[in-house]
């Protein structure tokens, strides 16, 4: 039921609301440890993540995003500032099937250094070292070009206008 309703939410199908309202809690204080919490916005998710990391007794490492070119807030696939440490629960934001994880795979940080984190993903045998990921920000525009016979043809041109680099 949960996955079916989550998929409905992803495509904007409001029929999932009854399910989530019936299975929601008004206070996180009563949630079991390591519960996955669906959030209405990034601000709430960032707050929960910060609380969980702050509660861990391990040295913290801060990762600050690198931005080049034209990058809007909606283009940022990860927070500009991420603080992690050993024991932090994380979820991948990228696909790397050769490394054994995809977008949404959850795991636990086993080590964090200035340039990477090492994660033991749930259900995996090996730990994975994850470095910063570079997302390209593309801008597309419709253009009219002439074909070889001089007739106008509509095309879409896409260009990289910026990059956003952060731990995924």
Task: Give the positions of each predicted feature.
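Conserved nucleotide-binding/hydrolysis modules and their immediate coupling elements
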Residues: 72-168
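Conserved helicase motor core of P-loop NTPases
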Residues: 1-99, 108-110
């Amino acid at each position: 039921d949960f996955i079916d309703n989550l998929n409905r939410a992803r495509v904007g199908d409001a029929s999932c609301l009854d399910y989530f309202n019936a299975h929601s809690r008004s206070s996180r204080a009563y949630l079991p440890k390591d519960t996955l919490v669906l959030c209405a916005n990034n601000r709430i998710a960032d707050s929960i993540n910060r609380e969980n990391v702050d509660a861990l007794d391990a040295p913290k490492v801060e990762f600050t995003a690198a931005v080049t070119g034209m990058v809007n807030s909606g283009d940022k696939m990860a927070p500009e500032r991420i603080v992690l440490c050993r024991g932090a629960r994380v979820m991948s934001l990228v696909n790397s099937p050769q490394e054994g994880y995809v977008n949404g795979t959850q795991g636990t940080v086993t080590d964090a250094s200035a340039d990477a984190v090492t994660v033991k993903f749930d259900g995996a045998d090996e730990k994975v070292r994850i470095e910063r990921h570079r997302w390209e920000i593309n801008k597309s525009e419709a253009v009219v070009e002439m074909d070889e016979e001089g007739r106008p043809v509509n095309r879409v041109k896409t260009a990289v206008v910026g990059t956003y680099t952060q731990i995924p």
